[in-house]
Each structure stands twice: as C-alpha cells, then as structure tokens.
From Swiss-Prot:
Species per Swiss-Prot/TrEMBL record: Aliivibrio fischeri (strain ATCC 700601 / ES114) (Vibrio fischeri)
Active site, UniProt feature: D75 (proton acceptor)
Family: Belongs to the Maf family. YhdE subfamily.
UniProt-recorded Gene Ontology molecular function terms: dTTP diphosphatase activity; UTP diphosphatase activity
Cysteine disulfide partners in this protein: none
A cellular component annotation (GO) from this entry: cytoplasm
Keyword annotations from UniProtKB, A to Z: Cytoplasm, Hydrolase, Nucleotide metabolism
Site (Important for substrate specificity): R13, T76, Q158
Reaction equations catalysed: dTTP + H2O = dTMP + diphosphate + H(+); UTP + H2O = UMP + diphosphate + H(+)
Protein name: dTTP/UTP pyrophosphatase
Length: 191
C-alpha cells in the first residue's frame, strides 16, 4: 500500500504512535540542526524545529517521490523555569537535568507540523508534568539503564522514567513525542 504520509523522524516512539493511529507511512531521514536561537522562546523553538523537519522532508521527496504526499515533522522539548532541557551529553548533564526536575513541575512541549509544497500546518501541545523527589541513587541507576541517553530532559515517560512522574496535565502521548488526537486532526486536513 502506498504511504499516506512521510514521517520525517527516526524516533522509534513517533513511529510507534503513528502506527497506533493506523496510517500507512514511510520514514524519511532528514538532517535539521537543532540549535536554540537567542531570541526564541521555548515555544518558538519547538515550533521552528517541527516546521524545519517537515519542510526538509518536503524538499527531500520533491524530486523522487509523490511530492503531494504530506510530510509530518515533530519535535519535543522539556522546559523548566523557562530553560530548555535537551538530550543529555553525558551522565553529569543528565544528573543536572533530573535534579532540576526532581520534586517539581515542568512543561513538555511537542509541536507537530504537516507540510506539502502548497500548505503547512502546525499544532503544539503543552503538557504539565510533576516529578517526585529523586535520590542520587535513583538517578544513577536510571542513567545506567541507558534509557535517558536519547531523551529530551533525560527521561522517557513510557519507560522506567515513568516511575518518576507523580502527575500529568495534558497529553501523555505528546510527552512520548506525538500527540495522537492533534496529529490525527492535522492529517485529516491533508488526506
């Protein structure tokens, strides 16, 4: 069956969630530099990255595939006190982030963009997440599991990092990397 959409992401979580929605899709590998600009608020940043990924996907398929097939780009960031927590560079970085989140509330922002050469639409979901207080031992054991290495904010809610979450207000799937309802609504505008 022909793809209904191209997913401009290598994230296994986004692949899993798009599959859950029941869409036929192909994965595109896009290279987008993820550098926060000084003038950007966290919201502007996550939306720009989402759009950049979708537009890079549109450019990638223009010459080789059906250029009218929509491309989905998405990005997720973790924000506490207005500071963006990216993927950790090493254990020290992950520990710094997890200690900052420990016992506190933070935001997870996920932007989803669908693009074709003629049209682009973006939706952003902001979810409030509360963490329990973490011990240094919990942080070390979590790091040793390998799970935090490729995750914004150094945790994955869908894995063992979920044990740190005491409450959420918003979309669980957005925290994972792709809000289901909003993604489905966007795709319906294109299909």
């Amino acid at each position: 069956m022909e793809a209904q959409v191209f997913l401009a992401s290598g994230s296994p979580r986004r692949k899993e969630l798009l599959t859950q929605l029941g869409y036929q899709f192909d994965v595109l590998s896009v290279d987008v530099e993820e550098i926060h600009q000084e003038h950007e608020t966290p919201l502007m940043y996550v939306e720009r990255l989402s759009k950049d990924k979708a537009q890079a996907g549109v450019k990638a398929i223009e010459k080789t595939k059906n250029k009218y097939t929509p491309v989905l780009g998405s990005d997720t960031i973790v924000v506490i006190d207005g500071v963006i927590l990216e993927k950790p560079k090493d254990f020290k970085d992950a520990k710094r982030m997890l200690l900052a989140l420990s016992g506190r509330q933070h935001q997870v922002m996920t932007a989803v963009t669908i693009a074709t050469p003629e049209k682009i639409r973006t939706k952003t979901v902001i979810t409030q997440v509360w963490f329990k207080t973490l011990s240094e031992q919990e942080i070390e054991q979590y790091w040793e599991s390998g799970e935090p290495c490729d995750k914004a904010g150094s945790y994955g809610i869908q894995g063992s990092g979920g044990r740190f979450v005491s409450r959420i207000d918003g979309s669980y799937h957005a925290v994972m990397g792709l809000p289901l309802m909003e993604t489905d609504q966007l795709l319906h505008q294109f299909l």
